[in-house]
C-alpha cells in the first residue's frame, strides 16, 4: 500500500542586502523622507505618526494571546503576503506604509516593518541584528526578539530561530556567519531609542542553541495525540501502529515530514509548532474525508536524521450485524 507523504516546510531566508558602510547614526538624526541608513530609518520612520497609523490595524489583527503567538502570526503573515524583491532598483529603505502597499522589499525593509509591528504593540526586548558573512562583504539585517530569556531571529519567514539554529541553517545555505551586531530598540514617550551594538561572534551564536532530546520528542507525540482526540470523535487504538486490529477495517496511513525539525525547533514556541502540525493533519483534504467514517487513530513521532516524521493511522470499526431467525 502506498502511504501518502505530506511535507511541511519551514524556509529560512538569509539574503544579504546591505552594502558595508561607516556608521553615521546619532540618537537625534535629521530625518529624510527616505533613508538609506538602517538605524536612521528605524528611528525616523517609527517615530512618524503616519507610519504608526499605517501599522496600527495590521498589528492589532496579528496580536496573539502572548508574545510567542504574536511573533508567529507576524512571520506567518509576512511569509504569506510579502515577497523578497531581488530587483529592487534603489537602496533606500521603504517606509512601512510603502512596503505594505508594494508588498515586496529587501531585508532592511522587512526589518523595519517587523520592528514597527512589535513596537506598535508595545513589546519590549526587541531589536535588530546586522549579520556579517565570511564569503561576502554584503551584510544582512533581521529583526530579533528576546523571548523568555532566549534571543530569536525573526527573519522574514517562519519559524523564529534561536541563534544556534540560525547560524547552522545559514551555513547549510552556504552563508557562513562570522559575527552579528546586535541592537536593542525600545520606545519611550513616542521616541525610539536604539542601544548597541553588542558584537556576537560565531561561538556566541553556537552557545545559544537548543538541542531537542527524546523526552521532548515524546512530549510532542503525547500532546499531538491528546489534541487529535479532543478535536475529533476518534479513539486512540495502539494496535494500529502495527496492523489492523480485530474488529477494525480499512486501516490507512499517512506520513508528515518536517525537514530540519531537530535543528530549527525550540520549545518556547512548542504550542505554535503543535498547532501548525495539527492543522496540516486535520485539514488535509484526504485525511478529512477518511476521518468522517473512521473511529480509531494512532499517531507516532520519530526522527530520521534531522527530520521529524509523524505517522498517522486511521481505521474504521467493523460493526457486525447478526441475523434473527423467526421460529414458529
UniProtKB/Swiss-Prot annotation:
Membrane-spanning residues: 3-23
Membrane topology: Single-pass membrane protein
Compartments reported by the entry: Membrane
Alphabetical keyword list: Membrane, Transmembrane, Transmembrane helix
Protein name per the record: UPF0252 protein PF0978
Lineage of the organism: Archaea, Methanobacteriati, Methanobacteriota, Thermococci, Thermococcales
UniProt similarity note: Belongs to the UPF0252 family.
InterPro entries on file: Papain-like_cys_pep_sf (IPR038765), Transglutaminase-like_domain (IPR007562)
Predominant location category: membrane
One Gene Ontology cellular component annotation held by this UniProt entry: membrane
Origin superkingdom: Archaea
